[in-house]
Amino acid sequence: SIFCCPSCQKPLCREERRLVCPAGHSFDVARSGYVNLLLSQQTGRKHHGDDKRMVKTRSAFLERGYYDPMRQELIKQGLAAARQGMTVLDAGCGEGYYTAEMAKTLREREYRPKVAGIDISKAALQEAAKRDRETEYAVASCFHLPVAGESVDLLLSVFAPYCGEEFL
């Protein structure tokens, strides 16, 4: 996994249907394919991000192609920076519209990337995981990225909250 433990910041390793760190913290992978790495004290709220209706509405809009030119430009920029085995993180990935297409393109061109997406919305990540089963998805905040420093080669953050300190 490219993710780190949100409690101790140690690397997480996949063990069947969960991610585990050396300190013994364990995070179950949901049946739909994402893992929840958002600690309750990081937001102070019970419900996070977009609900199912909002995700469904946005997905329907995006599938009409209005943002395809932008998505294609992002992919073009990503390919310009591409290298073998690169790590890609989409911070605020939503339903995976940009993430899945970037991952698909890099895989088709045999870059063998490690791709992950985070979002604060479980509903959005359920859709993202359906769209792309090979990408790792986690419920997490852009303000507390669950990745090691300097471990990401390409960072996407499209229409998501910006946290400059986390993106350095």
Which residues fall in each region the model found?
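Class I SAM-dependent methyltransferase Rossmann-like catalytic core
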Residues: 44, 49-73, 77
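Class I SAM-dependent methyltransferase SAM/SAH-binding core
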Residues: 87-90, 95-144
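Residues lining the SAM
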Residues: 158
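N-terminal auxiliary segments of SAM/dcSAM-dependent transferases
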Residues: 1-47
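A short acidic, Gly/Pro-enriched loop at the edge of an enzyme's catalytic core
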Residues: 143-154
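A short glycine-rich, Lys/Arg-flanked "PGG" loop and its adjoining helix->strand segment in the class I
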Residues: 164-168
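Glycine-rich helix-loop-beta junction characteristic of Rossmann-like nucleotide cofactor-binding loops
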Residues: 75-83, 108, 145-146
